[in-house]
């Protein structure tokens, strides 16, 4: 398996991207990595690992650039070069921690959508009390209709099925209340269609339900999804900081911390977003993974692991098959 990595994308590029990629090569003996970036940055890395290939790109799409404009103007950027390699099937997946909007725009323009999907969705995995939950959309589509939400549900169902190894993952529709009549017209219409579908639809879920892991898939528009994602990241960070402050307050709390250190480490690990890799762009014709913009080596390593699992489990073809099998159910 050959994975392409954007070495120039993200807040800590290129150093942490390179470090995470080299670590993945040590850990996974059945992968090759193609690092894409500026020659002056990557030159000399070839000798470090025989399964590492370098592809030079003279441009970088920055986080503050307008996505569509950057994609059209910077054809020799590390991001677009990587997507082109994927289009030509020279690699099996592409991963970037760079500009999210540019990655989505570039993937759409370069690779296109799966037949039957109107809009691709960003699908991160969130840690919960009972395991993990797929959230989609997490920011790609701020305005959605009911048909978009139903399509997100189908893609999320397949993704959770393959990645979590659950035959019938529970699908919930994010809403302001659990009652069927709650929400705007788009959400109400999506509820009716999901209720009629063959998915394991459990109904509406509220924000407070998500951390408890009441379902394996949460469906919403990108505006709401991004707010959920950022809120949960912020809360996890605050809890971690509060625990650290309280447990180091004095000698007695420090002694108590020693007694529960094992449990604290497990909690911290479970709440750490870097443990969950990146978010696939579900609905794109080829495997594209978006790593967190703040990713360091550990997060990049786990995003590569996720990309590998995504390809190994043939998630895209299973999504295509599910879309074809549901047919008219996806037309709202």
UniProtKB/Swiss-Prot annotation:
PANTHER family for this protein: FATTY ACID/PHOSPHOLIPID SYNTHESIS PROTEIN PLSX, PHOSPHATE ACYLTRANSFERASE
GO molecular function: phosphate:acyl-[acyl carrier protein] acyltransferase activity
Organism classification: Bacteria, Bacillati, Bacillota, Clostridia, Thermoanaerobacterales
Source superkingdom: Bacteria
Location(s), subcellular: Cytoplasm
Gene transcribed to yield this protein: plsX
GO cellular component, one term: cytoplasm
Family as reported in the entry's similarity comment: Belongs to the PlsX family.
Presence of keyword Cytoplasm: yes
Protein name: Phosphate acyltransferase
Subcellular location, principal: cytoplasm
Reactions this protein catalyses: a fatty acyl-[ACP] + phosphate = an acyl phosphate + holo-[ACP]
Annotated pathway: Lipid metabolism; phospholipid metabolism
